[in-house]
Amino acid sequence: MFEIFVDSAANIPAELVKAFKIKVLSFVNLVNGKEMTCFDPDLTPEEERQKGKDYYDMVRAGANIKTGLISSGVFEDAFREALEADKDVLYFSLSKNISGNYNSARIAAEDLMESGNYTRKIRMIDSLNASLAQGILAIYASEMREKGMAFDEVADILETCPAKMNGVFTVGDLKYLARTGRLSGTAAVIGNVLSIKPILRGNKDGYIVQYKKCRGRKSALNELISLVCNNIVEPEKQIIGIAHADAYEDSLYVMEEIQKHIKVRGFINTSYDFCTGSHVGPDTIAMFFMGNDRELQGMK
């Protein structure tokens, strides 16, 4: 038996966390000097959406927000509990080239394994991405576990998936990318004036890079739809992830348009994690799906 862990950047809604028996370790943000836990396991989907709206309204209003890492001590305590219950540990991480979280978990895992106190194993999978790119892989792992597949078999299969799991997104305001150094302040101002909406993606090394520029929000949303429909493989077997930073109507639009073109197993449509979402800003729409690789083909 094994436990499946994610950090709250994985964006798995609370009801699915319970259904798939996934353990979530939450980021904690400082909002105007007060701690705010990013994941609440007891919220309904409606409450999650309202909390997301309230949070991103605070971001729009200029709240002072600081994000941080989950400490190695928190990881160590969580992993130890599973090991002491005679269970292996499988952890799906936010890309180590986006966050230092992977390293925190690695330190915890090494300390536990080097102690010699446990016969069970810890395996970590770097999603090379963020948000539902992590979450969907964790859900697939849970489904394999439910079928009775062995720990190493599940981990071996899912270790091959980050190279195929695509994440593409567009933002509402370029100033948030400028704050994180992904765009110059001057370029952000000019881009906003001209209504330039970049399409960004996670590349094969787990870095966020620009894919192309679109003129206007609707054009950017349609480009996201095209990228999903043109690059997804075996969509009828896949869950497509949609994470939005208080852009619910736009999330419904892209979901409905995709269904006009391809038949998919299902969607997860949820509010963007507050930690990573703070860096991309309100009105961001991100989409996650499996392709043959991460070399995207655009509109056809």
Regions found by a protein language model. Name each.
Residues 60-96, 103-107, 155, 162:
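Glycine-rich phosphate- or other oxyanion-binding loops that anchor nucleotides, phosphorylated ligands
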Residues 1-3, 88:
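Beta-sheet entry/capping signal
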